Amino acid sequence: MPPKPINWRMYSKMAVAGITCCVGGPALIYYISPTEEELFLKYNPELQKRSLENRVGKQEDFDNFVARLKEYSKSDRPIWVEAEEAARKNRSGKIEEQAKLMQEMQQRKEEIKKSGTKLMPGGSL
């Protein structure tokens, strides 16, 4: 029994359908998706104003984030390990700073008590 002939018509239909899905789908999404400018123009004026005010701050935050990622990537260790270590150092630094502030407040209170001045209820110390 001779081998079956190749069904070129079926394979060509499948190739056309595959190319249509692989190329046409992303092209359709690209065509339909609005640009940032179009979205911005659809905002109400209050949101546009707020967005313009916050734009510089968000850009600075993003630049700082990218700079930290570049710094983390210089190490041989994974980025998430470096980021976790930096966050831990940041937290411990804040805790130490809060402890120093509390100690200074206690010292001020003691100085006031020693000087004989009465603390007023609702006062700042």
UniProtKB/Swiss-Prot annotation:
The chain crosses the membrane at residues 15-34. Residues 103-125 are annotated as: Disordered. It is found in: Mitochondrion inner membrane. InterPro entries: Cbp4. The keyword Phosphoprotein does not apply. Signal peptide: none annotated. GO terms for cellular component: mitochondrial inner membrane; mitochondrial membrane. It comes from the Eukaryota. It is a single-pass membrane protein. Residues 92-119 form a coiled coil. One of its GO terms (biological process) is mitochondrial respiratory chain complex III assembly. Keywords: Chaperone, Coiled coil, Membrane, Mitochondrion, Mitochondrion inner membrane, Transmembrane, Transmembrane helix. Belongs to the CBP4 family. Essential for the assembly of ubiquinol-cytochrome c reductase. It has a direct effect on the correct occurrence of the Rieske protein, core 4, core 5 and apocytochrome b. This is Assembly factor cbp4.
